[in-house]
């Protein structure tokens, strides 16, 4: 069912792509376990860098790791020192040459993983869970490519004795529709009362004919002051003429 299954796994090859790009026969289990270790190491080491996604691509000689982050400065470090340290650690972990690509996520409020992480960080800092959830929903719905969002928090919310689940949503989130582009992210908040799980679904439109609505609805570059066609407004010309008459 659409509500139970992972949205990314359900839409693999339809609207979403694999996060590991390689082929293996007898070494499949070894590569898979290695990918898991690489991702766990990066998430643990760069917990404050806002890691949105990690894509791994393998060839015979080397491993390429693409890190999608909201704060690339933390990952790179001063004069690339942190990136060099990460590369050395990953080469020891994989036993191959590692090419590290650090990519910035510009639209943070439209990324489900970063939204979930933001809510979890607020819960850790003792912000009221309803306030954190509503703030995340309002920030996401301001983005032009976001058509709907659903947020779920589970655990001892507000320090209650009994754990419960709270859900908030706005707009459309069609989890059964395969052509729907659903971004999904999870994160855990470590509080004094225990762990609180955060899940976020963001609907960004449909994918029709290989074209994504989110790319079509992406915010365009801001024009200068003028009319819709980019021409200067007439008021400015009138002001210039009146000033010229006064000077004459």
Swiss-Prot record:
Residues 38-106 form the KH type-2 domain. PROSITE patterns: KH_TYPE_2, RIBOSOMAL_S3. It holds the Pfam family Ribosomal_S3_C. Residues 213-248 are annotated as: Disordered. Gene3D superfamilies: 3.30.300.20, Ribosomal protein S3, C-terminal domain. GO terms for molecular function: mRNA binding; rRNA binding; structural constituent of ribosome. InterPro entries: KH_dom, KH_dom-like_a/b, KH_dom_type_2, KH_sf_prok-type, Ribosomal_S3_C_sf, Ribosomal_uS3_bac-typ, Ribosomal_uS3_C, Ribosomal_uS3_CS. One of its GO terms (cellular component) is cytosolic small ribosomal subunit. Residues 213-230 have a biased composition (Basic and acidic residues). GO terms for biological process: translation. Keywords: Ribonucleoprotein, Ribosomal protein, RNA-binding, rRNA-binding. PANTHER family: 30S/40S RIBOSOMAL PROTEIN S3, SMALL RIBOSOMAL SUBUNIT PROTEIN US3C. Binds the lower part of the 30S subunit head. Binds mRNA in the 70S ribosome, positioning it for translation. HAMAP family: Ribosomal_uS3_B (MF_01309_B). Part of the 30S ribosomal subunit. Forms a tight complex with proteins S10 and S14. Belongs to the universal ribosomal protein uS3 family. This is Small ribosomal subunit protein uS3. It comes from Corynebacterium diphtheriae (strain ATCC 700971 / NCTC 13129 / Biotype gravis). The lineage of its organism: Bacteria, Bacillati, Actinomycetota, Actinomycetes, Mycobacteriales.
């Amino acid at each position: 069912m659409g509500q139970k299954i992972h949205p990314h796994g359900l839409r693999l090859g339809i609207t979403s792509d694999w996060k590991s790009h390689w082929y293996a026969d007898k070494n499949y289990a070894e590569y898979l376990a290695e990918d898991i270790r690489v991702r766990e190491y990066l998430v643990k080491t760069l917990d404050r860098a806002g890691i949105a996604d990690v894509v791994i691509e393998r060839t015979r000689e080397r491993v390429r790791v693409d890190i999608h982050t909201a704060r690339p400065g933390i990952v790179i470090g001063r004069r690339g020192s942190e990136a060099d340290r990460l590369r050395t650690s990953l080469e020891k972990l994989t036993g191959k040459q590692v090419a590290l690509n650090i990519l910035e996520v510009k639209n943070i409020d439209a990324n489900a993983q970063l939204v979930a992480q933001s809510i979890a960080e607020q819960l850790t800092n003792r912000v009221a869970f309803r306030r954190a959830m509503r703030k995340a929903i309002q920030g996401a719905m301001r983005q032009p490519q976001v058509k709907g969002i659903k947020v779920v928090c589970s655990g001892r919310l507000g320090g209650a004795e009994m754990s419960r689940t709270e859900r908030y949503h706005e707009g459309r989130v069609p989890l059964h529709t395969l052509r729907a582009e659903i971004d999904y992210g999870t994160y855990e908040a470590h509080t004094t009362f225990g762990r609180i799980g955060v899940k976020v679904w963001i609907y960004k439109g449909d994918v029709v004919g290989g074209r994504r609505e989110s790319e079509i609805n992406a915010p365009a570059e801001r024009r200068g002051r003028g009319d819709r066609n980019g021409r200067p407004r007439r008021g400015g010309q009138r002001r210039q003429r009146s000033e010229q008459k006064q000077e004459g």
